Amino acid sequence: KEGFILDVLEYYITYPTYFKLVQTAYEDNSYSKDKSMKVLKKYVEQHPHSIKKKTAIMLNHFMSSTIKKIDNKAKAMLVTSSRKEAVLYKPEFDRQIKENNFNIKTLVAFTSTIKLDGLEYTESNMNKIEGKKSIKEAFKEDAFKILIVANKFQTGFDEPLLHTMYVDKKLSGVAAVQTLSRVNRIAPNKTSTLIIDFVNKKEEIREAFEPYYTETYLTGKTDYHKLYDLMENIYDFDLF
């Protein structure tokens, strides 16, 4: 049981670490001339604040790395802090997907109806899923690659093809354990997971897991030799 959860934490990185990873790789002669690295360098910023900028970072990471995992079947989840944030993220993802001619679709999950700038938003009118399929059923389709959630599917959601999680929400205690564990389901040829956290600190996540597990991978300072190993897992340079 421990190892099952530790696999989740093995490839957990905070956004500042991800930023340093890209910066370090870009300065390395082995990678600096690679086109995909130049694209990632363009979008990665030290302190991204706007939804537009964070969407660009996540989407370009997904298209440069995650999409090729699990025999090109891998999916991602974005955990947002509120229904409003989820409603704002969904059209921005869709806009950038269309702008870049990426052949993927997104889904958004939140409860009830939210009013924003005089308009009412629901899962139904934002997702426009054909037929009577649920979000869980639709997400199993190959076209739907990214699921944006607000206080939904953070517990009890079982999707083996979920490889990457982007976290833009404060997490603590058992909620952190339950949320991050969404990516730990086993699937054929699924050999890794990845969590990029924009909000929480490494120490906070370690503390959340400690009451339940005797050890974690989130200890000590960043070892850049390990980061290079992680980089090989994160980036597949033949995409662009």
PLM features: residue spans?
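RecA-like P-loop NTPase motor core of helicase/translocase proteins
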Residues: 1-240
